[in-house]
């Protein structure tokens, strides 16, 4: 009954005044012993009585904000004026300090700042990615000593006319042929319609008397024999491919002409291949 009275709000004084105890219908198992001469209770006058009149003096007499409902307990909200509301103005941009302004007025400034941060971040990421890719690619490139071996210098005066000399270049055989005037005229007179891989002799040489070729057969990679075959050029003993003095395929299973590497004449007596 006390809990109901506490939750009843403004009806609590009425309910507490009309509350009374009602004896239950069950009888206790053990009969209480009533003394023959009951003693009168002694009241401790030093302790205050918890009555409505004594507690009314301790109630808050200032204006309160109270909320009362039928199914909820009564609640009281006090006004705390000593609580300091945190201010985050130092962390906010100047464009958004005024809370009364519309967000559309500061949208351009906010977007500009966002674009600036995005642009700077993109440039930084691109620069870091460029350095990473450059280091990765440079680690796979050939070193200086390997690049030095990628080129070979050949002294042409050591090769007599009508002879072919073989060199090793990048792990492959390199043929340098000093042609005679007869061979030059013979190869220049060949019609392109007779060739499997049509290519004029002048398109394969920089100087008519010098022919520089990679000595690897275009069929299965065998090394041809110089000054041999039906056309007086090169002959592959593996499957019988015949090349002329310009390195063009004339007979046999090879599909293409012998490869011409990149070379440059530095002088009349020196050529650099590679």
Curated annotation (Swiss-Prot):
Signal peptide: none annotated. Disulfide bonds join 222-238. CDD domains: Rieske_cytochrome_bc1 (cd03470). One of its GO terms (biological process) is mitochondrial electron transport, ubiquinol to cytochrome c. It is a single-pass membrane protein. Residues 141-274 are mitochondrial intermembrane. The keyword DNA-binding does not apply. It catalyses: a quinol + 2 Fe(III)-[cytochrome c](out) = a quinone + 2 Fe(II)-[cytochrome c](out) + 2 H(+)(out). One of its GO terms (molecular function) is ubiquinol-cytochrome-c reductase activity. The keyword Zinc does not apply. InterPro entries: bc1_Rieske_TM_sf (IPR037008), Globular_prot_asu/bsu (IPR011070), Rieske_2Fe-2S (IPR017941), Rieske_2Fe-2S_sf (IPR036922), Rieske_Fe-S_prot (IPR014349), Rieske_Fe-S_prot_C (IPR005805), Rieske_TM (IPR004192), Ubiquinol_cyt_c_Rdtase_Fe-S-su (IPR006317). GO terms for cellular component: mitochondrial inner membrane; mitochondrion; respiratory chain complex III. NCBIfam families: Rieske_proteo. The Rieske protein is a high potential 2Fe-2S protein. This is Cytochrome b-c1 complex subunit Rieske, mitochondrial. It comes from Pan troglodytes. The gene is UQCRFS1.
């Amino acid at each position: 009954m006390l809990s109901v009275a506490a939750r009843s709000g403004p009806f609590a004084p009425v309910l507490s005044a009309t509350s009374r105890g009602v004896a239950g219908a069950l009888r206790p198992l053990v009969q209480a012993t009533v003394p023959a001469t009951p003693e009168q209770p002694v009241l401790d006058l030093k302790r205050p009585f918890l009555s409505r009149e004594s507690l009314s003096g301790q109630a808050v007499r200032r204006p309160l904000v109270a909320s009362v409902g039928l199914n909820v307990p009564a609640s009281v909200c006090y006004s705390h004026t000593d609580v300091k509301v945190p201010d985050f103005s130092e962390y906010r941009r100047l464009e958004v300090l005024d809370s009364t302004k519309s967000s559309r007025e500061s949208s351009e400034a906010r977007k500009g700042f966002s674009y600036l941060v995005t642009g700077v971040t993109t440039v930084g990421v691109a620069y870091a990615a460029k350095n990473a890719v450059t280091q990765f690619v440079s680690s796979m490139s050939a070193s200086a000593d390997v690049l030095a071996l990628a080129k070979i210098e050949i002294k042409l005066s050591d090769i007599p006319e009508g002879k072919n000399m073989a060199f090793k270049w990048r792990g492959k055989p390199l043929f340098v042929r000093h042609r005679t005037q007869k061979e030059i005229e013979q190869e220049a007179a060949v019609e392109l319609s007779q060739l499997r891989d049509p290519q004029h002799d002048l398109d394969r040489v920089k100087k008519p008397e010098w022919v520089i070729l990679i000595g690897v057969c275009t069929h299965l990679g065998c090394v041809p024999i110089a000054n041999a075959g039906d056309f007086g050029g090169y002959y592959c003993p593996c499957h019988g491919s015949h090349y002329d003095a310009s390195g063009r395929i004339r007979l046999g299973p090879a599909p293409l002409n012998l490869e011409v590497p990149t070379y440059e004449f530095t002088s009349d007596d020196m050529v650099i291949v590679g």
